[in-house]
């Protein structure tokens, strides 16, 4: 009996020792598998939003900092190369809005902010300004890892970037006979890819190649159209913190504008649309006319035929006459993109005059811009010019 008790106690001590070691090993394993350890094997792209990529499986992650939660970012998407029959083409500005990241338990939600309505802040009605006005929930992504200080959150964004959750990509051009409409099909997840991560202090960009599949498509221009690629660039931009002054649109004059409805107004037409305009500031505010602190710079893309470059440059600089009437001297400057430039015209940090020669272009010229939807401030612009404009083919 005594011997049995001794053996039992020895066995119990041994079991408890194993349990303690196992628990310690588990804690060590959990610690080793923390955020920092997980990121060690990933490629880091430092910028506005820190991005990490697993070069083995191609998965892409956002590292969201605590001070980036609830913060507004400008979101912009444009086509790098498309298919005219699917309503997309190079330089096509696809989408523009404001998003923010919201922590919800073990998820990070990505909200698209509704900026269509405004209130007079002195009116008591403004206290109910969120009533029945809904933001759009783009996606909700599980937090993969959290820093020990709980101020950094890692989310995988691969599926987000390779879907139409951020923006609807294709819109088929209208045709009277629906049977003649080109049907691009659906996104092929295994064929689509994140081709590039481009990160800067003020914007985080991704170049995505979407492949759409539709086995029933007939050839276009003698090309197999069952699998079609559309390349686009997503940009997440730091919200501008400056002294830009919005300007309400005068309905008697045509402007590109941000639509705003004042829900506290008694006016029968309570519209306070904000015009899209550049942020120009006089260097010498005391003078009636002054050069700007930062001029508007347009680049002539290196795809532009040599004989056209002086003509294009002079045409753009002619806008300085109008700007001078508004008080700005040399508001616009024009430069030529070098052939060996290390940046592409798809980089939103540059305003570019671009030339293309497409098989079936939808226009001769096209001049879009993207803005801060809250204020109307133009953040960038491109001018697309097609060779067909000159050849008239």
Regions found by a protein language model. Name each.
Residues 310-317, 321:
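Solvent-exposed, polar/charged alpha-helical surfaces in well-ordered, non-transmembrane soluble domains
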Residues 305-309:
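Alpha-helix N-cap/helix-initiation motif
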Residues 26-304, 322, 326, 337-393:
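Auxiliary tRNA-acceptor-end handling modules of aminoacyl-tRNA synthetases
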Residues 1-26:
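Bacterial Sec-dependent N-terminal signal peptides
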Residues 332:
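Conserved structured catalytic cores and adjacent interaction surfaces
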């Amino acid at each position: 009996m005594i011997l049995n008790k001794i053996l039992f106690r020895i066995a119990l001590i041994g079991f408890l020792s194993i349990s303690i070691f196992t628990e310690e090993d588990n804690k060590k394993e959990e610690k080793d598998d923390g955020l920092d350890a997980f990121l060690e094997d990933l490629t880091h792209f430092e910028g506005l939003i820190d991005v990490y990529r697993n070069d083995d499986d191609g998965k892409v992650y956002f590292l969201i900092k605590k001070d980036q939660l609830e913060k507004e970012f400008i979101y912009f998407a444009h086509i790098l190369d498309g298919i005219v029959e699917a309503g997309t083409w190079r330089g096509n500005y696809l989408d523009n809005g404001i998003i923010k990241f919201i922590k919800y338990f073990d998820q990070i939600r990505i909200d698209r902010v509704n900026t269509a309505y405004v209130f007079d802040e002195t009116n008591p009605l403004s206290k109910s300004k969120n009533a029945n006005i809904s933001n759009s929930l783009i996606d909700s992504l599980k937090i993969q890892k959290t820093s020990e200080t709980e101020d950094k959150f890692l989310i995988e964004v691969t599926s987000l970037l390779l879907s139409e959750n951020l923006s609807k990509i294709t819109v088929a051009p209208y045709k009277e006979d629906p049977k003649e409409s080109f049907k691009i099909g659906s996104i092929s997840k295994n064929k689509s890819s994140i081709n590039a991560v481009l990160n800067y202090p003020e914007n985080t960009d991704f170049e995505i190649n979407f492949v759409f599949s539709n086995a029933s498509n007939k050839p276009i221009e003698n090309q197999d159209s069952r699998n079609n690629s559309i390349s686009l660039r997503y940009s997440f931009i730091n919200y501008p913190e400056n002294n830009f002054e919005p300007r309400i649109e005068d309905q008697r004059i045509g402007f590109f504008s941000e639509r705003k409805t004042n829900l506290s107004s008694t006016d029968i037409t309570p519209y306070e649309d904000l015009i899209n305009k550049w942020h120009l500031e006089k260097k010498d505010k005391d003078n009636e006319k002054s050069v700007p602190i930062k001029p508007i710079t347009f680049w002539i893309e290196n795809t532009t035929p040599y004989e056209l470059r002086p003509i294009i440059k002079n045409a753009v600089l002619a806008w300085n006459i109008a700007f001078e009437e508004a008080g700005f001297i040399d508001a616009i400057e024009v430069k030529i993109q070098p052939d060996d430039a290390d940046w592409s015209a798809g980089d939103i940090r540059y305003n570019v005059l671009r030339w293309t020669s497409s098989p079936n272009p939808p226009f001769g010229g096209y001049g879009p811009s993207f803005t801060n939807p809250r204020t109307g401030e133009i953040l960038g612009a491109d001018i697309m010019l097609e060779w067909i404009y000159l050849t008239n083919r």
